[in-house]
């Protein structure tokens, strides 16, 4: 807010009536700041230190999910403060308000993980409610942990207020036995310890050193994926995703976001002016070229639905087939977001794709410049290194990529008529046949793995974990990491109607739709059924006839909801299919299953 000043007794007399500050007619905050009938409203603002100058300025909300529950968000008060200062200095009226967060890592492997995807919806709903109720003119949406990012972007799109997306930045890598590590190595260490491949002392050292400070998980996991895609979509300035959480550049990015929020109000630029079908295709191309999280499939579908843009799960596969994987970060590789930042950040990847005609640089961004213009601006004004100046063993030329196709694969077949999602972190030609080992929940599967029962060739099936059936579509990094830690990264497949963490690696296939709860074929599987996973052909099949699948489904008892009251029950009853983004906004419910 502006510097506190002594009240000017003549201020109201300068206009025709109290509260006549000559505000912009376009600003809906006029409804609460202007006119004699709004004197009580202004009195409330004055109680918080706002002055006449503030009340004549655009009211810019800064939703902030700061919390001590996760290192992803523990520093966000400082990030938000820099944004507030930027708004104030640029002539806006900054108003910070809170919203929730869930720590995916801390809730992982517990019943509490069912809250994770629900939190995406609660964040979007809460930001919409506050900005609607308080008649805000614009937003700077601050985000840290995984579901913060799509939740904030959904709110910006749904309200269509001039908005700037602001990521809190990622954590630096930890050090263990002379190598960089992240939280994912700790999860995998649990599996290695259970199999006797890691000592208790080694696991303890890994636990104590993997996470050295504030910031979101460091690899190309869900938070860093969605932050990168915010640049591709145009909702955040180019170069804003990669500065680490505890780096001074992160706070410069935050201050600039605040200044930019005032600009987008003045220039009347809205998310609907920025987002197009092509901007979503750009985001998918970047996701698959960087080996981004499978969660981004779910979130991009939800964002497109909010924007009223036709996007289908098969679009991800079509774009992945034509887009090579050129960045090799964790979990597929060894490097983290900070390594990418040191060579120029997300813009250097976008530039390579754009120069190969795999990314459309003509799309508008929040700055008012196109992607192509933004790249030129970064090169000329901010020292973005040229391609010739980049020497990095984890960033590949488009004509000599890490993999000829992108990392995201959409599989279909009689087990997943509406699709399933896989991120390839290893063999692009993976083909697997084996017997089903069927579990009705994640906990039973985890126990099976930790007790050493899995064998080479197995296909672990975890069902009743979908958006409605879970409810909440839990991530399963615990069990997938345990499989990898037990030495079965390449010879055991895992299928589920739930989700995976962005840190998952190996042949783990999620988002199977329809889910078991609504009668999907995964609900018909029995132990020993022969399953084939064929990545080159993009198929996932069980060796059963359609009539046998139908018979089994007809004979099964209709499932009962896992929860009948409370927030989990409420959102569980609202979720749509994973194949359409698992949205809960009733205006977007066209198919539901």
UniProtKB/Swiss-Prot annotation:
Residues annotated as binding Mg(2+): 104, 146-147, 475
Compositionally biased tracts (Acidic residues): 1-17
Pfam families: ILV_EDD_C, ILVD_EDD_N
Alphabetical UniProt keywords: 2Fe-2S, Amino-acid biosynthesis, Branched-chain amino acid biosynthesis, Iron, Iron-sulfur, Lyase, Magnesium, Metal-binding
Keyword set includes Nucleotide-binding: no
SUPFAM superfamilies: IlvD/EDD N-terminal domain-like (SSF143975), LeuD/IlvD-like (SSF52016)
Catalyzed reactions per annotation: (2R)-2,3-dihydroxy-3-methylbutanoate = 3-methyl-2-oxobutanoate + H2O; (2R,3R)-2,3-dihydroxy-3-methylpentanoate = (S)-3-methyl-2-oxopentanoate + H2O
InterPro entries for this protein: DHAD_IlvD/Edd, Dihydro-acid_dehy_C, DihydroxyA_deHydtase, DiOHA_6PGluconate_deHydtase_CS, ILV_EDD_C, ILV_EDD_N, IlvD/EDD_N
Similarity section: Belongs to the IlvD/Edd family.
This protein's name: Dihydroxy-acid dehydratase
Biological classification of the source: Archaea, Methanobacteriati, Methanobacteriota, Stenosarchaea group, Halobacteria
């Amino acid at each position: 807010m502006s510097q506190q000043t002594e009240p000017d007794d003549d201020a109201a007399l300068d206009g025709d009536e109290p509260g006549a500050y000559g505000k912009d007619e376009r600003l809906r905050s006029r409804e609460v700041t202007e006119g004699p009938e709004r004197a009580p409203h202004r009195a409330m603002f004055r109680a918080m230190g706002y002055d006449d100058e503030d009340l004549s300025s655009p009211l810019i909300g800064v939703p902030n999910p700061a919390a001590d529950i996760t290192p992803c968000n523990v520093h966000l008060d400082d990030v938000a403060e820099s944004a507030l200062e930027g708004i104030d200095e640029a002539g806006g009226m900054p108003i910070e308000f809170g919203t929730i967060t869930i720590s995916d890592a801390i809730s992982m492997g517990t019943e509490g993980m069912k809250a994770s995807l629900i939190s995406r919806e609660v964040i979007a709903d809460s930001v919409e409610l506050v900005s609607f109720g308080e008649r805000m003119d614009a937003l700077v949406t601050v985000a840290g942990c995984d579901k913060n990012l799509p939740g904030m972007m959904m709110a910006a799109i749904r309200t269509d207020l001039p908005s700037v997306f602001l990521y809190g930045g990622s954590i630096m890598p930890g050090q263990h036995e002379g190598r960089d590590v992240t939280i994912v190595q700790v999860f995998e260490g649990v599996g290695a310890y259970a199999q006797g491949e890691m000592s208790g002392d080694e696991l303890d050292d890994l636990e104590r050193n993997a996470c050295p400070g504030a910031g979101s998980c460091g690899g190309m996991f869900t938070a860093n994926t969605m932050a990168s895609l915010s640049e591709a979509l145009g909702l955040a300035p180019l170069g804003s995703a990669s500065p680490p959480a505890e780096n001074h550049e992160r706070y410069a990015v935050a201050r600039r976001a605040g200044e930019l929020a005032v600009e987008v109000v003045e220039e009347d630029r809205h998310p609907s002016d920025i987002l197009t079908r092509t901007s979503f295709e750009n985001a998918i191309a970047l996701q698959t070229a960087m080996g981004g999280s499978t969660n981004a499939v779910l979130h991009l579908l939800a964002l497109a639905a909010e924007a009223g843009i036709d996007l289908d799960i098969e679009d991800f596969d079509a774009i992945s087939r034509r887009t090579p994987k050129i960045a090799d970060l964790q979990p597929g590789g060894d490097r983290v977001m900070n390594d990418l930042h040191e060579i120029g950040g997300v813009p250097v990847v976008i530039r390579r794709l754009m120069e190969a005609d795999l990314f459309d640089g003509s799309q508008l961004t929040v700055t008012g410049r196109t992607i192509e213009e933004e790249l030129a601006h970064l090169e000329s004004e901010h020292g973005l290194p040229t391609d010739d100046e980049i020497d990095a063993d984890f960033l590949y030329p488009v004509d000599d990529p890490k993999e000829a196709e992108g990392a995201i694969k959409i599989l279909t077949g009689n087990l997943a008529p509406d699709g399933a999602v896989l991120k390839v972190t290893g063999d692009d030609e993976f083909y697997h046949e084996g017997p089903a080992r069927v579990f009705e929940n994640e906990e039973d599967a985890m126990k099976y793995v930790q007790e050493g029962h899995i064998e080479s060739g197995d296909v672990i099936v975890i069902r009743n974990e979908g958006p409605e059936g879970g409810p909440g579509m839990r991530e399963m990094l615990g069990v997938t990491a345990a499989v990898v830690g037990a030495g079965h990264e390449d010879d055991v497949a895992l299928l589920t109607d739930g989700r995976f963490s962005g840190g998952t690696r190996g042949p783990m296939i999620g988002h199977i739709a329809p889910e078991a709860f609504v009668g999907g074929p995964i609900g018909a599987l029995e132990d020993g059924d022969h399953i084939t996973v064929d990545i080159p052909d993009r198929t996932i099949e069980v060796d059963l006839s359609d009539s046998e699948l139908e018979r089994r489904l007809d004979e099964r008892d209709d499932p009962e909801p896992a929860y009948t009251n409370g927030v989990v029950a409420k959102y569980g009853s609202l979720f749509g299919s994973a194949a359409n983004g698992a949205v809960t906004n009733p205006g977007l419910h066209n198919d539901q299953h």
